[in-house]
Amino acid sequence: MLPWLSNGPAMNFTYPKSFRSRKIAANGTVIHVRIGGMGPAVVLLHGYGETGDMWAPLAARLVQSRTVIAPDLRGMGLSAPVDEGFDKKNQAEDVAGVMDALNVPDGAVIAHDIGNMVAFAFAAQHPGRVTRLVMMDAPVPGVGPLG
């Protein structure tokens, strides 16, 4: 394990004190988002059953030179509970709405697990707003297991 990811025997998912938490009305729902830093924006999209808290160790590093935006995806974490709108194209519009509310025209997008689907939809729908796209723990469509 990388030393900056470890905080003794358990992971530390606490954001630095310089981050602020905000609820943003976007695309017909309310999205909870953590924001910190200054510089080029990076949007961090979490996986299924997780929240933006999963990004705290990475965010603590990125905030030194970037504006970090870590939302809780629609209906998860501290975002408003909802019963609909979970298709990835719609959630991509949630991300666009958050960026609009923060006056962020573009940025790098880093995603994990189900956040990859939202990130891919966002990049497809808003290609001019994505400066870089990083997708982690993502199966590649059309490529099966080796063997």
Cite the ranges covered by each PLM segment.
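Gly/Ala-rich beta-loop-alpha elbow adjacent to hydrolase catalytic centers
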Residues: 111, 115, 119
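Conserved HGGG/HGGXW glycine-rich cap/lid loop of the alpha/beta-hydrolase fold
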Residues: 29-81
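Active-site loop/oxyanion-hole signature of alpha/beta-hydrolase fold enzymes
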Residues: 15, 24-27, 34-36, 70-112, ...
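A conserved short beta-strand
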Residues: 128-144
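Short beta-strand segments
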Residues: 44-45, 110-111, 134-137
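Residues at the starts of beta-strands that form the adenosine-phosphate
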Residues: 67, 106, 129-132
